[in-house]
């Protein structure tokens, strides 16, 4: 076993600066299935601040205490009532704060290698902690790791308490408070009165659920970066469109073609107004590209059924809509199925269209159907790659990950920990340069990763290829 790359300096408990007045918050049908998955582990890499690390640690402790006042559930614990319902008790029990050092590691060591280095996993607390343990462990931990020329701020938060949208709202607020912002505008909404709050009971074993994937399988993890121009080129190809000289889709030319296309005219009954640029999104195009490339790399027979699973935000899909700042999980996982033969024999548009139509169909009725299905059979979420042919997309390039300025710089990079990693787990991050650039954190078996790196259709869009 390799020696630890990170040395613990101190560990303490941080309490909210003000007492909470929130009542217990019942876990929803989106929260409860996450009791069997690891805590979310996400964090940001920064250059070294222009003041001593001891001053930074004091600042972050104070800022975290003040931030918890805006997010009381994170300082609480899970409690279960006699009927089996699980709640967050906003009891101000506190969160863990860890100060660690790895002063032999430089920023270039974190972001300069092809694969994500193993030592990045040590920048996060609560390694392999399962969300059910929130009954007797803090729901949040923050670790600040001092590097030779930088600092990594890593968070681990219980996945039955937050989804990605709620997590990044917390992290952004933590950064705002640290840099002296007095008025927090994006106040979380703790309302619990939607269809997601159910009377169904999730029955669990007395010692809690276990993760549903092998945590010790050999894996490779790599960040693939896609510039805005590459993504626009990919989107245009997916939609059978042309780009103009600025790299934008030539809308005028496309609309003229559609005006004279009998098929488009015949489809008028289905859609009166056609927005050509919105048919297949940039992100769906990128997902289709990855689906095809990984399917090729896995060398399946054409009859093998593959699955591409996407998480969708339900906040704006429900009627009435949830507040965009609703705090908790408001996501559902959509599986899209296609045989390996169909994925590879059809073009990019066909693959992206399968993703597009399933996401579009996930409206208020479908969200409620998913809720009713879960209520008939309450269960934990089966996270993993059970037949070797699955891809699971998480996170989102829309999350404001690079808005986290704690007072001296924006992040140099965003990284995640070991949590919930298995063959076929993909996470989407915004690129640091912004403007629609995207980073894909791809976790695959070593042999599949090798095949992906040799896939010319995929790699032609990757930055630096």
Predicted regions and their residues:
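Soluble acyl-CoA-dependent acyltransferase catalytic core bearing the H(X)4D motif
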Residues: 2-22, 36-37, 41-73, 77-401
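Short, low-to-moderate order helix/coil transition modules at the start of elongated helical scaffolds
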Residues: 23-30
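Short alpha-helical interface patches
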Residues: 32, 228-239, 446-455
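Short, surface-exposed beta-strand/loop micro-motifs that present aromatic residues
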Residues: 33, 139-145, 423-431
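Low-complexity, glycine/alanine/valine/leucine- and proline-rich hydrophobic stretches
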Residues: 386-465
């Amino acid at each position: 076993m390799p020696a630890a790359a990170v040395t613990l300096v101190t560990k303490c408990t941080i309490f909210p600066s003000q007492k909470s007045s929130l009542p217990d918050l019942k876990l929803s049908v989106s929260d409860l299935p996450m009791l069997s998955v690891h805590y979310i582990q996400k964090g940001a890499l920064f250059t070294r601040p222009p003041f001593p690390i001891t001053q930074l640690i004091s600042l972050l402790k104070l800022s975290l205490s003040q931030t918890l006042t805006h997010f009381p559930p994170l300082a609480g614990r899970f409690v279960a009532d006699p009927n089996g319902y699980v709640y967050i008790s906003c009891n101000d029990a506190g969160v863990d704060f860890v100060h660690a050092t790895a002063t032999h590691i430089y920023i270039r060591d974190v972001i300069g290698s092809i694969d994500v280095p193993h030592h990045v996993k040590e920048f996060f607390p609560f390694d392999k902690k399962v969300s059910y343990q929130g009954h007797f462990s803090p729901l949040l931990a923050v670790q600040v790791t001092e590097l030779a020329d930088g600092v990594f701020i890593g968070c681990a938060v219980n996945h039955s308490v937050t989804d990605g949208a709620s997590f990044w709202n917390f992290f952004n607020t933590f950064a705002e408070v640290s840099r002296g912002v007095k008025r927090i505008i994006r106040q979380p909404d703790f309302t619990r009165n939607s269809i997601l709050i159910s009377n169904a009971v999730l029955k669990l074993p007395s010692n809690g659920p276990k993760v549903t994937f092998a945590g010790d399988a050999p894996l490779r993890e790599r960040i693939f970066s896609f510039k805005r121009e590459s993504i626009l080129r990919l989107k245009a190809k997916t939609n059978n469109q042309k780009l103009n000289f600025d790299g934008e889709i030539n809308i005028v030319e496309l609309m003229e073609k559609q005006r004279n296309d009998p098929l488009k005219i015949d489809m008028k009954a289905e859609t009166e107004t056609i927005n050509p640029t919105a048919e297949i999104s940039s992100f769906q195009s990128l997902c289709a590209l990855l689906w095809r490339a990984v399917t090729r790399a896995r060398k399946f027979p054409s009859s093998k059924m593959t699955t591409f699973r996407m998480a969708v935000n339900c906040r704006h899909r429900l009627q009435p809509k949830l507040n965009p700042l609703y705090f908790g999980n408001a996501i559902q996982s959509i599986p899209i199925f296609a045989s390996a033969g169909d994925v590879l024999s059809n073009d990019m548009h066909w693959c992206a269209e399968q993703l597009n139509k399933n996401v579009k169909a996930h409206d208020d009725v479908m969200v409620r159907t998913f809720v009713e299905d879960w209520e008939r059979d309450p269960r934990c979420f089966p996270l993993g790659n059970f037949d070797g042919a699955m891809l699971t997309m998480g996170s989102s390039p829309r999350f404001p990950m690079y808005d986290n300025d704690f007072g001296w710089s924006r992040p140099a990079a965003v990284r995640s920990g070991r949590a919930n990693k298995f063959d076929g787990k993909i996470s989407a991050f915004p690129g640091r340069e912004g403007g629609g650039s995207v980073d894909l954190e791809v976790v695959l078996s070593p042999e599949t990763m090798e095949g992906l790196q040799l896939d010319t259709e995929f790699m032609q869009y990757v930055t630096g290829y």
